């Protein structure tokens, strides 16, 4: 499958609003039933014991995803400031980060006006489409991940990628997997599309895409 085919497949999946749509698209591409293209999440066949014990409600799982987007935006800003997020020079709290990166007085969103708040909010979008069982999309302008980094970020458990960053909220690298317990009814589907934010300039890789399913 060349890049043109992968791009077409990715766009088709991104436009899908139902589980059946996704299954049909992947079946036509001869991917759904091909065991060779599917890998165990985090490389472990016991991953569900962790994934299935994150949040007790779908609301909590969704909030965790948004928190990860907030972290991604703050990390991007930190890197663009030329600061190593794990260093002593990095902000020691989310309030300090908001004050430094977004010039928010006392680091509290309540201290800024509607215009500034709206401008910051444009970094993250939550979009719902479909009818009875909507498809939920979370889009952020955060740091992003290159395709080669997927296995150690989006598709990992307990890696602690953010454990040394004092200004982020999701430190343990597994809370975002909680949505997999509340996804589409049969296969718990999740589509991930990402690339490294071009403002960071530490990777020349293009877009990456993966589908997560429960088997």
Question: What annotation goes with each model-predicted range?
Answer:
Residues 132-136:
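Short beta-strand element(s) in the Bergerat
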Residues 140:
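Acidic ATP/Mg2+-coordinating residue in the GHKL
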Residues 74-82, 147, 163-166, 188-192:
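Short, solvent-exposed secondary-structure capping/transition elements
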Residues 153-168:
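Bergerat-fold ATP-binding/catalytic subdomain of histidine kinases
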Residues 143-144:
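Glycine-rich G1-box
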Residues 70-74, 159, 184-188:
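Non-catalytic alpha-helical coupling and interface elements of nucleotide-dependent molecular machines
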Residues 5, 165-215:
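GHKL-type ATPase core
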Residues 1-122, 128-129, 148-155:
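Bergerat-fold GHKL ATPase/HATPase_c domain
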């Amino acid at each position: 499958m060349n890049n043109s085919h992968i791009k077409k497949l990715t766009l088709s999946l991104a436009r899908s609003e139902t589980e059946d749509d996704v299954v049909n698209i992947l079946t036509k591409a001869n991917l759904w039933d091909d065991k060779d293209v599917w890998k165990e999440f985090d490389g472990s066949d016991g991953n569900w014991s962790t994934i299935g014990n994150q949040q007790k409600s779908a609301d909590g799982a969704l909030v965790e995803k948004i928190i990860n987007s907030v972290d991604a935006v703050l990390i991007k800003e930190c890197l663009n400031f030329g600061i190593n997020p794990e260093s002593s020079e990095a902000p020691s709290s989310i309030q300090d980060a908001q004050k430094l990166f977004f010039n928010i007085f006392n680091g509290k969103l309540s201290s800024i006006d509607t215009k500034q708040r709206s401008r910051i909010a444009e970094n993250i979008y939550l979009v719902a489409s479909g009818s009875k069982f909507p498809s939920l999309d979370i889009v952020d302008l955060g740091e992003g991940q290159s395709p080669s980094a997927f296995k150690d970020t989006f598709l990992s458990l307990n890696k602690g990628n953010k454990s040394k960053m004092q200004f982020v909220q999701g430190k343990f690298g597994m809370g975002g997997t909680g949505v997999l317990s509340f996804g589409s009814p049969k296969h718990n589907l999740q589509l991930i599309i990402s690339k490294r934010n071009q403002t960071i300039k530490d990777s020349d890789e293009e877009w990456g895409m993966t589908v997560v399913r429960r088997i």
